């Protein structure tokens, strides 16, 4: 299966699919942290390239409700971010999963099909992740664990905090590849 992982610099989801024999590519404006099939560029230039599945991680900077106190000052940025999300959702790709934290996508476009937590996939942490799905089943939990630490939320400010907050948990990446990759 040809898999596009949009807006991913970590390479985690791409590699989860690659390990299972898929032709998986990540595309992001940043270079990839992991070696592999990665294009540094604008994903919109690649949406028509005959993909079977896309997992999209649009930047949450102007979408996440955690930044609600600044919403009034960034209406134009929100409008552009929502337009980008619509571009991804409307891509000519048969199967699509778009992920983002709790965000204005829910109130401006549509409610998510599913909300998952890292603790459902082997990581003893909380970080609600919404999934908007097209022709894909909901993810089934793979390893429910105890512990509900808010590690990501408690991170101290730093220049790289946003990068750590945006990395997909490996348990979730593996579940996507195992469950959605098997449904080809």
Predicted regions, residues:
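Conserved active-site and SAM-binding loop architecture
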Residues: 1-184
